[in-house]
């Protein structure tokens, strides 16, 4: 399994430069729904106990299995609202389903995600989690 590291940077975005031109964090903060998410005490404890690298591994696995395939039968419903810090982060960052990825990150539906896109998504999720715990 590939474990992606580092903070998101424009050079890592590859096919999705509009995210940075549109200022992702500002746009997410202006969404009532997206900005309503935060890590609860149990999520923070989980991150503290497992560590960011283990949480990153989980994020890579979730993205590879739940978002990367070209066709997802339950798209829009595949990411629980709670139960893991990565799930919460996915909703907060609009990386929860292919529809949200298309709308917010300009990553088209109907095709398999590239490794660069998966890395970008994991980096967005991990940056949000990092911002939440610090």
Language-model regions, residue ranges each:
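Sequence termini and other peripheral, non-core segments
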Residues: 1-29, 119
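Iron-sulfur (Fe-S) cluster-binding segments and ferredoxin-like electron-carrier domains
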Residues: 99-119
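Core of compact, soluble alpha-helical bundle domains
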Residues: 16-63
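Immediate flanking context of iron-sulfur cluster ligation sites
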Residues: 73-93
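Short Fe-S-cluster ligation motifs
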Residues: 120-134
């Amino acid at each position: 399994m590939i474990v992606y590291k580092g903070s998101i940077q424009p050079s890592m975005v590859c096919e999705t430069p509009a995210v940075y031109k549109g200022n992702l964090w500002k746009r997410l903060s202006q969404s009532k729904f997206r900005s309503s998410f935060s890590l609860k005490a149990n999520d923070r404890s989980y991150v503290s106990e497992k560590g960011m690298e283990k949480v990153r591994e989980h994020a890579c696995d979730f993205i590879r299995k739940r978002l990367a395939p070209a066709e997802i039968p339950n798209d829009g419903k595949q990411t629980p609202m709670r139960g893991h810090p990565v799930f919460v982060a996915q909703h907060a960052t609009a990386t929860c389903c292919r529809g949200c990825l298309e709308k917010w990150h300009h990553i088209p539906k109907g095709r398999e995600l590239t490794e660069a896109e998966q890395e970008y998504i994991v980096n967005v999720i991990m940056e949000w989690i990092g911002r939440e715990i610090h």
